[in-house]
Amino acid sequence: MKEEASEHGGSADETQELSPVSDSSDEMPNNAKRRRRSQSMIANKRIHQAFQEDEGDEDWEEEEHKPKAKRRYNTRSNESFSEGDDEPFEVSESSALEDELSDSEDSFIRSVRSKPKYKPGTRRSTRLRNRRSQDEEESEEEHRPILRERTSRINYSVPLAFPPVDEMDGDPSSQVNQSRSRKTHSELAITKLLRQQVSSFMPYIDSSGSESESDNTRIKKSSAKTIKALTDPANSGGPPDFGRIREKSDLADSDPLGVDSSLSFESVGGLDNYINQLKEMVMLPLLYPEIFQRFNMQPPRGVLFHGPPGTGKTLMARALAAACSSENKKVSFYMRKGADCLSKWVGEAERQLRLLFEEAKSTQPSIIFFDEIDGLAPVRSSKQEQIHASIVSTLLALMDGMESRGQVIIIGATNRPDAVDPALRRPGRFDREFYFPLPDRDARKKIIEIHTRNWDPPVPEWLCSMLAEKSKGYGGADLRALCTEAALNSIKRTYPQLYRSTKRLQIDPKTIKVKVKDFVMSMKRMIPSSERSSISPSKPLSPELKPLLNEAFQDIEKTLQKLMPVASKLNPLEEVMYDDPKENDFEYQQRLETFETLRIYKPRFLICGRKGLGQTALGPAILQQYEGVHVQSFDMSTLLQDSTQSIETSIIHLFLEVRRHTPSIIYIPDIDNWLNVLPLTAITTFSSMLERLDFSDQILFLALSSSPLSELHPQLREWFSSKQSVYSLQYPTRDSIIAFFQPILELIKASPTELPGGIPRKRRVLPELPLAPDPPPFTSQKITLKQTKQADMRLLNKLKIKLNALLGSLRARYRKFKKPLIDFNDIYCVDPETGHSYRSREECHYEFVDDVVKQIGSDQKFSMMSLEEIEKRTWDNCYCTPKQFVHDIKLILRDALQLEDSETIKRAQEMYANVLLGVEDMEDDQFSQRCERMALREAERRKLRHGKLQKHLDETKADMQFTSEKPSVDESITEVDDAIKDGPPVLAETLTNSLMEDVGPENVDMDIEDNEIFTNQSTMSVPSMLVENEESPKPDEYIDQKDKVQSPLLNGKSPVGVPSEAALRVSTDVSTNISSNGRADIPVDTLITSPADVPNNAPTDAHNITSADGHIENIEQEVVFPDLVFDEDRLTPLKQLLIDSTTGFTVDQLLHLHSFLYQIIWNTKSEWNRNSVVDECERAVKEFMINALQ
């Protein structure tokens, strides 16, 4: 605008005033803004000059007491008031302001000089100019008085919440009397007084010695890190952890798991082959690395466990970790589940896996066990999310990538191997795959023996064999649950009173014995895990059917042995135990293998016959004999159970399972209906898959048909073309029918006393068991007390960190209270040794009299509390609760109120309010309650410890008066006594420990009072007094020494929460062995002084605990039974009737008649006239025959 105006021969103002046309609405605002800027520049110049003049007139003392951030640079003297102030930004800011003002001034002067001589303008322009000048003068007059009243410029920078960690305590502006080289008498006396005040509430947590000093130093360093992180400008915004780089341990839980040392391979039954293979994977490379170096190879480093649930996959991994971690060798064990590595953040799961493998490498040899690995590494597909594919790819690369993972063994466990990505199931990643089937008979017997080997009395071997026979289909977890339920049943049978009382009764556990009935009851209620999803097709032949089907069963079994012989395979370790003369002959080894396979040709077998001849019982019985062979049922329920896939797809999947687990059996229970219901495509698919099997494959095709041989389906004739592959069932013979009904005839002539339930059972009369005393703590008291102390120390450290953070903000904002409000030089104090004082009483305003600082001429007392003293008490473990911290802050406020300085009172009240707000923010309900309970425990420990120590000191002084052989002991006692009275409790605790180890006659442990405190606080514990010593006194000595051992607090009146002497004596009777160091028990007779000390319900004799037989009192009364009425000749016609009428019956019809007769015998089991039972059976047979013929 200026250049444009100069081109027309004048300035913009001249153009405005000369030309009325130029005074338009568009040009007026621009001119006004320009004038306003020029006038403001002049005003700013004046303000700056006035500010500089005020800065030069400031007093030195006022400048010294100002904070660093408020002191400014003196422009007149060109010097800084404090050379140590690190504020270069303020100087540069001031200089930049001056340069800006000078530049604006020069431009304004040039613009004024370039203007021509002023010419009078129009009336309107003059009126506007006068109005602007008046407004500027008014605005200048408004701001000028306020600006002139300011003594310093305002610091607009945001203050730090906490002071810097490296802030020097030697700042001359924040310390008073720093120039003194040594402390005065008043300062020494007041410091000693404050230390004595600390001893009234200082906790007795071990804080002396090198360990406590290192702990405090470590806590201070961690607190400094916390404060520094909070005061870091980079963390000023965002979440609390924004910008923080986490440590490696925070990113993944890479700590190895603790291994159960009691677990070993002996705890795993029926998996000896897999145990040997795992040993050669882990043990051999550690013990014999030269073997693998000789062949320049790496041992297998990955194995996949798969099988049904509850078959011991996780147990095997735990046993491997325990077996490898012995005394000579240590193997780290890491266990991860699928969800442990997953995260909602992108890439975090992959990072967790990488850190896990890195940690395993650093601690190799190590084992990583992935439980349920199908959830971590599922099959990758196009429909799957990308995150899962990335995790699988990362796991594949870590297991077998460019870098070798060293001696890191990977174990995966799953019950769905088809859901695991196929890339994992190759050598290099998972070198081996172990299939954990359901245990066979021998394995079940071994598992039962493992779970019952610690029972007293042990389970007999015949019972273990019987249980193994009856528990077909049970897994390892099911057998463990079976033994647990049997033990619980024995408890119910022996002591049913326990389930009727809510209180603890007195019993003898040795009387509880597990019997056969307990196992039978357990098997009735249990459902094996293998039968929860599907019913097992195998079932043994019942004893009732053996007379009818035993002959056919043996014939079928012999035929199947020829069709598909299943020889017991030896594992490699058992194979090498036998000599092989042709170990290097390849043809011989190949011929040996062909002998085993070429003798098999398409093993197929069909059981046919009329319906009801026992096909449904023979099929499961045959499968029962092939224990350990994979059985795959192709019945209709299996093919149609998955509605999402077709029948053909189900058939293909089932055939894949059959071929994967050889030897195996394809089982179809009702093949006639199967062929009639299935579509032609499904039958064709099955036939095609069946024909694709190799002729020597050990895959048996077993089918059951309800049609006779002459009426078989054409498809069946095609599949079972050989006569050897078909067995036709026949009707039962006469001899088999006689053997079938013979048990019924024996039951008819039996008396009611021989029949189960024939005579009503007597109801047991259960005696009332006495109440048992309160049990001792379930864990060692010494261990529990140690854990309590550690928990208190952790809680105290947490409180110290919070209080230190609050103190940091107080130190930065309230530096006036860093030292006591009263100067030590202003206190009159006389040295007790010399009787002199540094200053006279007339020169001082305060005096130190009777351990109190008073104002001369008044009764006002001062606590001399300061922030430095509070900080020292914080790190000396003096504050157990935040209330104690607030109490000392309140002392500072009280001193400020007594000084009657308005500024000091205001600052003290502000500090006290901030402390109350900070304490309220830092604590919650649980934290406050925990701190209060910790303070009570510490006070009780201090009271009991001081009492016991004082008691021992008094006894030692009394003994030393009669003996002069050990004069050094008296000196030590005097020193200890003085230390207790004057020194802090930490020193007293240290001296107490040393004295009680050397001087105490009974060597009483200093943890006795902790034991008593724990006993008082525990509701389930019995009050007891523990005398822990390596050499315990004899019973006779204990009577003489008991007065010395007991605490003085227990004499006379017992304080609240401390057990009395009578309670201690009774507790010794109740708990016969509480000592944790294995010393001899104290006899009961030496402790009980009067019958009143023993509670009424506490037994004093071990014989009061009766056995199980003594608990159950059966009413032994002579019961007269009536005479048995039975005619042997009446039984012959019934037998002949059964044989004649049932000839030509099928097996199902015979079973029906059999159950009908059993019902009659059950209803007449209490009948002593057995002839009437024969009549009812004859009548039932005739009625059954009439119904069967109809």
Swiss-Prot record:
Catalysed reactions, as listed in the record: ATP + H2O = ADP + phosphate + H(+)
Function of the protein: ATPase histone chaperone which facilitates loading of histone H3-H4 onto DNA in an ATP-dependent manner. Plays a genome-wide role in nucleosome organization and establishment of chromatin. Also plays a role in heterochromatin assembly by stabilizing recruitment of the histone methyltransferase clr4 to methylated histone H3, to promote the transition from H3K9me2 to H3K9me3.
PANTHER family named among the record's database cross-references: AAA DOMAIN-CONTAINING, ATPASE HISTONE CHAPERONE ABO1
Phenotype caused by lack of the gene: Abnormal nucleosome distribution. Decreases level of clr4 at the subtelomeric and pericentromeric regions and at DSR (determinant of selective removal) islands containing meiotic genes; decreases di- and tri-methylation of histone H3 'Lys-9' at these regions. Abnormal heterochromatin formation at the pericentromeric outer and inner repeat regions, the subtelomeric region, and the silenced mating-type locus. Impairs centromere function; leads to abnormal mitotic and meiotic chromosome segregation and sensitivity to thiabendazole (spindle poison).
EC number: 3.6.1.-
Ranges of biased composition (kind: Acidic residues): 52-62, 82-106
GO molecular function, one term: ATP hydrolysis activity
Keywords, sorted A to Z: ATP-binding, Bromodomain, Chaperone, Chromosome, Hydrolase, Nucleotide-binding, Nucleus
Signal peptide (residue range): none
Binding residue positions for ATP: 309-314
Bromo domain: residues covered: 794-922
GO BP, one annotated term: nucleosome disassembly
Basic and acidic residues: compositionally biased ranges: 1-11, 141-152
Region (Disordered): 1-185, 204-253
Protein name according to UniProt: ATPase histone chaperone abo1
Enzyme kind, highest EC tier: hydrolase
Subunit structure: Homohexamer. Interacts with the FACT complex subunits spt16 and pob3. Interacts with histone H3-H4 (via N-terminus).
SUPFAM superfamilies in the record: Bromodomain, P-loop containing nucleoside triphosphate hydrolases
SMART domains membership: AAA
Extent of Basic residues compositional bias: 112-131
